[in-house]
Amino acid sequence: MASSKGSQNHRNLGCNGKQALLPPKSPFTGGPTFSADFVPSSVIGSKAVQKLGEGNANHHRTSSESFLIEEQPSWLDDLLNEPETPVRKGGHRRSSSDSFAYVDVPVGFDVDYTLWDGGRYNNNNGFSNHVRGPKESDYLRSQPVPFYPSAHLSKQKIRPWDSLPDSGARPNSSSGCLESSSITRSGSSGSLRDTEKAYSAADSKKDFINNFAKSSFEKRDNPLAKSATSEADTKRARQQFAQRSRVRKIQYIAELERNVQMLQV
């Protein structure tokens, strides 16, 4: 009898040791483990929250389980107290973690419109982030906006003179060109003078070449002009030859006189 009691005590001690190593059992026997942080939006309601408190009354809960179930997070209370239709607020912006069920507009529409709206406000005010109010969002939902507004943005051309009043103060291209040319001329007067001198020299060369070509053509065309030029050339050649012959004669006479004087001495 003593040996049987000892073996039973030994077995009970082994079972108690194994149970101490095992994790605590879940309070819900009819399904997998459940946490209040992962409550889906479709199940949220007063009945679902009441079911969280129900369970096995005889089961002893640990301190961590009671803390998770009794102290619910603040966002869960807000979702439970929130009406079915969300109340729109002018300065409220939902974060990316909020569920899709509480947003009326599709995500793609909102993203595309924010891109288009940001570009519009960049041109006007210089701010890329723009928070839309309830009136503006309602008006935009009523208007048919395309899913890809980038094609329409590419067609828009921003012209600076469109923002000017209708008093006739529009820029003139000719006046702008004249002003720029006058500024450059006043700033570089020395270079303009040099270029004018170069142009005048080139013009004079062109005039000389044209006159020479005209005279040559006239001489070739007129036979009388040819004969006159030939006679003038012959006269000049004869005069030059006579002058040379006179010079030679004078030099020869001078040499002869020198030789006579040398012989007399």
UniProtKB/Swiss-Prot annotation:
InterPro entries: At4g06598-like (IPR044797), bZIP_RF2 (IPR044759). Residues 180-191 have a biased composition (Low complexity). Signal peptide: none annotated. Residues 1-11, 170-179 have a biased composition (Polar residues). Transmembrane segments: none annotated. Residues 1-33, 158-197, 219-244 are annotated as: Disordered. One of its GO terms (cellular component) is nucleus. GO terms for molecular function: DNA-binding transcription factor activity. Disulfide bonds: none annotated. This is Uncharacterized protein At4g06598.
